[in-house]
């Protein structure tokens, strides 16, 4: 039952992120279910934070996940994803407080004030990724946590920029204010298709692409490494 439910979640997120299937093929067979569950769990929480339009609905969903992460920490998980993660000594050693921060950081990411600079914007996603790094270290003891945080932050920033219209509907701005100022475009004008908006997005993609090239790759998780390469390819295609 749990295995079937996990497979359903993997199928769901593979449809949204095709490179996930490739990454899971390289995972050790014994640890593959937990690796898949952790990836899908984080994706579910990011989706609730950044892709549910109504704030109140997003908050209810995130509060539910916060309760479920607390249940996981207490050894009483109910959801198939958290049930799959239970029983691993390294994950079980993660404190309830850390799981709680992993959930609350998602809402903070949604409600962050507009960022002045590219680095300020990246810090928004980095704060979320930092809360999930200990879970990655629990499953990948050799992972470079700082490199994983940087790679995940850039992945989140790219997806948020590509979903610009959706973010604006939530009154969020996934681009730095300095970029709007440089192109002399207001937030309201950003909501309308235009050559100026296309130029802003190309510049943001260029920033992200350069930052991706600087990420240390030797000790990333398999999923982060595969996703990073796929995102670099996406940036190249969109920047043409």
Predicted regions and their residues:
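Hydrophobic alpha-helical segments and helix pairs
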Residues: 85-132
């Amino acid at each position: 039952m749990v295995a079937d439910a996990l497979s359903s979640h993997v199928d769901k997120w593979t449809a949204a992120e095709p490179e996930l299937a490739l990454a899971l093929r390289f995972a050790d067979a014994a640890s593959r279910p937990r690796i898949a569950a952790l990836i899908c769990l984080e994706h579910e929480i990011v989706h609730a934070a950044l892709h549910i339009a109504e704030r109140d609905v997003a908050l209810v969903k995130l509060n539910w996940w916060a309760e479920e992460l607390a249940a996981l920490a207490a050894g009483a998980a109910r959801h198939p994803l958290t049930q799959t993660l239970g029983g691993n000594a390294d994950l079980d050693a993660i404190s309830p407080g850390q799981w709680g921060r992993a959930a609350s950081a998602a809402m903070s990411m949604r409600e962050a004030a507009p960022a002045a600079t590219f680095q300020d914007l990246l810090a928004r996603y980095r704060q979320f990724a930092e809360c999930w790094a200990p879970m990655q270290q629990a499953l990948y003891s050799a992972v470079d946590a700082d490199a994983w945080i940087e790679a995940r932050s850039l992945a989140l920033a790219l997806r948020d920029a590509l979903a610009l219209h959706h973010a604006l509907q939530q009154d969020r701005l996934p681009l730095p204010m300095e970029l709007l100022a440089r192109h002399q475009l207001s937030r309201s004008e950003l909501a309308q298709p235009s050559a100026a908006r296309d130029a802003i997005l190309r510049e943001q993609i260029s920033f992200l692409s350069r930052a991706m090239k600087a990420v240390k790759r030797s000790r990333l998780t398999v999923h982060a490494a595969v996703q990073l390469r796929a995102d670099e390819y996406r940036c190249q295609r969109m920047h043409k």
